[in-house]
Amino acid sequence: GKLQWPVSGKIISKFGTQINSELNTTTENIGIEIECPKHTTAMTIMDGYISKITFIAGMGNVIIINHGDDYKTIYSNIDGSIIENSDGTKTIFSTIDPSIKVSENQYISNNYKVGTISNNLTNNSGILHFQIWYKDKNLNPESWLIQK
């Protein structure tokens, strides 16, 4: 991979099928989960347009960025408040650093502050759930990011 990481941290849940032998369960992870210090700022890995800002149960606040050529990245578990603008678009403000805010249809450059990561209540760290899509296929983000 050649792309910068969206946050500095370590992958705690890999892409694809995860087998838990203790619980005898199998789960499918459509992205990766990166553990980072709480309140870490997430950065864009490519330039593009914010196509959607929404809340999804189990994923928290979600920001979807369209990078053109049918590529999208999805940042989940983003801290902040979502407001609806008079034109119907949404804006998300970080409650940790209010200077960090993005809006739907906004063009953002590579390495742009897109949000802060919500605190994970169990261990005082943050977890970013990060996905890369091409058309309707989810890709393994780890293979796109610079190897650590």
Question: Where does each model-flagged region fall?
Answer:
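Extracytoplasmic/periplasmic cell wall- or extracellular glycan-interacting regions that localize
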Residues: 1-52, 57-59, 64-66, 94, ...
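A structural signal for short beta-strand/turn segments enriched in small hydrophobics and glycine
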Residues: 11, 42, 48-50, 86-89, ...
